[in-house]
Structure formats: structure tokens, C-alpha cells
Amino acid sequence: MRAEKQDAPVLSRWMKVLLGVSLAVLLAAAAVIGVAMHDRAAYPRVLEQICALDADAAERTLHGVIFFHDADEPDYARLTGLALQTGDDAYAVLSALEDEPFPAAFGDACAALEQGALDALMAQARAAYKAGDTDTALRDFELLCERDYDAACADWLLLARVRSGCTMSALAALYGETQDAVLARLTALLPFADCPAAILSNAGCAEAFLTGRWTSADGKSLTLTRSGAGYQMQTDLLDEAVPGRFFLRDGVYSVGADEASAQPLLRFEIVDAGTLRVTRVSDGRETTLTRS
């Protein structure tokens, strides 16, 4: 009878231990299940965040995965990396999306990222153009035109080609048009962006635009005509004739034996398709000319 009385407390203690262990196991299992649910939910959330173009949030979500990693995690990481890169090099992002396709389940996120990259590329292309980086601007605007981003891309591309030094004959070949048709394209752009300055930055385009007779209200005139392989300019805007060849660079008309030693005489500014503002370098006198 005494042994039986001693066994009951021992059994009770073991039951408590067993219950404690069971509870700990259940809590651990619940924690594991919670982590699993958290990890599994992270991947769809990454795609949602990329669709919203929130690359930083997508990166944080992906880094928050603890134990249960999706088989496609490398693709999630690659897509997130591209999203993070969009603000710095949208061209590379678009190239990667085209060259290395993602699984079909990533379709919506890829489409959103592509559109975001195109938007970023337009801004980057314009910034490159304004900074004088014509090589990058040409590359970016060409891709935007290939993707039919918007109608303005073709206008920006034409200006980038002019700024890059394309001759009128090269531009005509690129567009499959005559040089007169290319000039009409450029003239139709005025005053879009810096089109007036772009035309004057390219000697061939400037000469083509200035060709013809221009007159002022007080009877002054300037005439540019094609002469053989070059051009000839006649004007009474100067007090006296200066001997030598004429050169036209960045809107400045100079005359001399060669370009390095040529004397700057007139500075041109395109007001619109039929109006020029001409400034004499010697005294700053301005004259407005209209196309006759």
C-alpha cells in the first residue's frame, strides 16, 4: 500500500513533463508553420511590389524569407535586381528582359517592369542628350523608337543624329528621303526642344537651312547659294568684305584662309522657319531677317 501511494505522485510528475514537452512541440510546430506561411506569401508579394515599381520593398521582402525558399527564388532575385537597376541603367534592364526570359508566372511583373524601364529610359535619353552624350542618346532613342514608346522619340532621335554630326546625305540615306525632305523634317520640328541650336550645330544642316535669300525691314540682305561642292554667301550686313573661305560652326559665320585662323563675323540664331536673328560679332548689332 505504501508503494502504491508513492507511484501516484511520480506518475503525475511524468504527465506534467509529457504535457510540457507536447506543448513545446506544438508551439514549435506552430512557429514553423507560421514561418512557412510567411515565407510562401513573400514571393507573390515580391511580384506585387515589382508591379507597383517599388523595388526597394521587393528587395526587403525577399531578404525577409527565413527558411522556406521557393525553387524559383533565383528568378525572383534576378527580377528584383533588375528593378533596382532601372533608375541607373534602364537600357540594360530592357536588354536583360528581352535576352533572358522569366517564367510565365512572372508575366505581369515583367510587363510592369518593362514599362517602368521604358519611362526611365526616356528620361535618361533626354538627360544624355542635354549633357552632350550623343552616343548614349542615339542608342536610347533608337531603342525607344523600336518599342514605339511615343511619337516624340522619333523627333528626339532626329535631333540626336543632327547633334552627332550626321551629314545631310547620311540623314537622307537613314530616312530613305531626299535632302530637301530631311530639311523639311527639321524645319517642321521648330521650335521643339533645342532644334534651332541643333540645326546650327551641324554645318551641313545649317547651310541647308540658310540657303536662299534673307532680307530685313531696312533693306539689308543675306544670300547663301550652293556653289559647286560648297556654298557661297553674300551679305551687306558687314561694313567691308573679308577675303577668304567662309566657315559655319555652331551658328557662327567666320571667314579666313582656314577654319583655325578664320575671323568670326556674324552669329546666327534661328527664330522660326522663316526668321533669323543675326548679330555682328564686332559691335553686337542685331538684325532680324526673314526668308524671301
What are these regions (language model features)?
Residues 200-206, 218, 242-245, 277-292:
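Edge beta-strand at a domain terminus
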Residues 199-215, 225-228:
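N-terminal helix-cap/turn-to-beta initiation motif at the start of protein domains
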Residues 82-94, 114-130, 158-173, 192-208:
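Alpha-helical linker/edge segments of TPR/alpha-solenoid repeat scaffolds
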Residues 215-262:
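N-terminal glycine/threonine-rich, aromatic-flanked beta-hairpin/loop signature
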Residues 7-26:
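N-terminal Sec-pathway targeting helices
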Residues 58-65, 89-100, 136-142, 167-182, ...:
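Alpha-helical repeat scaffolds
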Residues 39-50, 77, 115-129, 155-156:
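Alpha-helical tetratricopeptide repeat
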Residues 43, 74-78, 108-109, 122-123, ...:
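Alpha-solenoid helical repeat scaffolds
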